[in-house]
Regions:
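C-terminal non-catalytic interaction/assembly regions of soluble proteins
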Residues: 135, 143-184
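C-terminal binding/interaction regions
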Residues: 2
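Short, well-ordered, mixed-charge alpha-helical segments that flank or form enzyme active sites
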Residues: 13-17, 35-39, 80-84
Length: 184
């Protein structure tokens, strides 16, 4: 028989875990989602790896944006949470970071900032766009039409779910896993 169940995941996994617990199965849930959007937790397994994977991709995009003097709109995952975009944007020194929690859909203001940056001598720009805002290809087209600056969109997508786990994710997963076994 089954003595207990350790469920690693996000909201959907936890809903399933709750059904098991309601049926009398000794169940514990560990927060595991790149989105960092689980209530009542400060950290989720996978978030750090996703941020680092996206950060490395954005570093490479900055190089080509710089050499071609273009604007790059980079869409990162996160569903309706902007944590990946925020962390990547700060870590990569993005000129703009668009997250669902704060962006008011004022594209005119965004375009004005891009124009001002170009006028002040900035030759390239990175805009990190959260998945919850989306429409990166349309945004890139809108920016290029309004500014005349060559603008490309890159959607990192499931690339962020791959790669080797960071040391932080490995340690947190190990500690949480050991604690979960003790709790069962």
């Amino acid at each position: 028989g089954i003595d207990g169940m350790v469920v690693i995941g996000g909201d959907g996994s936890f809903r399933g875990a709750q059904k098991l617990a309601d049926a009398g199965v000794n169940t514990i849930g560990l927060p595991g989602t790149i989105d960092l959007d689980i209530a009542c937790t400060d950290y989720t397994i996978g978030f750090d790896t996703a941020v680092n994977t996206a950060m490395e991709a954005i570093d490479r995009l900055r190089e080509t944006s710089n050499s071609h003097e273009r604007c790059s709109v980079v869409e990162v995952m996160g569903r309706s949470a902007g944590y990946i975009a925020l962390w990547c944007g700060i870590a990569n020194g993005a000129e703009q970071i668009l997250i669902p929690e704060k962006f008011d859909n004022n594209y005119d203001k965004l375009i004005e900032e891009i124009k001002n940056n170009r006028a002040s001598g900035m030759t390239h720009q990175i805009i990190v766009n959260a998945e919850g805002i989306g429409h990166s290809y349309g945004l890139a087209k809108k920016i290029e039409e309004a500014t005349g600056i060559e603008t490309r969109a890159t959607i990192l997508g499931h690339l962020q779910r791959g790669g080797s786990p960071t040391a932080r994710d490995r340690v947190y997963a190990s500690v949480m896993g050991a604690y979960a076994i003790d709790c069962i």
